[in-house]
Amino acid sequence: YIISGLQLWLLRDAGQVVPYLSPEREGVLKPFKDEAGYWAGVYFNLEVIGVNTKLTQPRDMPKRWEDLLDPKWKGRMALENEEIPWFASLQQIMGEERAIDFSRRLAKQQLQMRSGHTLISQLLAAGEVALTPTLRVNIAETLKIKGAPVEWAAIEPVAPNAPVSLGLAKNAPHPNSARLFIDFVLSREGQTVVRELNRNPTRGDVEQPVPRATKVKLFEMHWDGVVKNYARYVKDFNDIFGVGAGEK
C-alpha cells in the first residue's frame, strides 16, 4: 500500500498490514516511521503561514499562533474546511484546553472556509485573502517562482501532515517483490526521486526541495492518538468552524 498515513493506520488496526523492518528505514526521520515496522513515510506536506506580500508588510508576519487573533486579520484569512490533522496537531503542540480556546477565538475572525489547498493558494496569490495558516511549502515556492506575491513563515515547531506512507499488505500476492519495492522507495535513491517530484522526502540525508524548509523545527506527532480520536476531532472542528469537515 502507498496511501495517506491515516488510512494506512486504519488498515493496520484492521489487521490488513504486516510489519516489515526494511534496512532502509534507518535513514527515515523518526516522526515518519513506527518502531514496529507497520509503516514508513514516503513524503510529507509541510504547512506554514502564508501571506500575500501586496496586502501585508514583513512586520505583519505572525510569529505566534495567537497573532492570528489580531483584529487586523478579521475577514482576511482563509482556512481549508477539512483541516482535521492541523486542528489535532494544535492540540498536541499547545495542549487541548489552550488549542480549543485558540480555535474558538480564531473562528470569530470571519475566516473564509474553502475546499482544497490549491484553491486557497490561488486565492492568496490573487489577493482575495491576505493570509492562510496552512499553506503548503511546495505550493508556496511554486507560486513564488511564477512571480506571485506570496511569502511564508513557520511557527515552530511545525507538525508535518500525516505522511503519505507505505506498508506491506497482509495478503500481498508477491511479498518479496513488495519488500524490495519498499526498500527502494525508502532508500536514498528512491527518496531523491521523491524530491525531484517536488515532494518532501522523509529521509534525513536527502535535502528537501525547498532548502529553507530543511531548517524548520518539526514536531513529532502521536498519530495513533489522532486515529483513535478522529471522530471527536472532526466533531469539534465542525462545531467550532461551522463546516462539515471529514463527513463522508
Model-derived features with residue positions:
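A structural signal for short loop-to-beta-strand junctions that line the ligand-binding cleft
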Residues: 3, 17-49, 66, 76-77
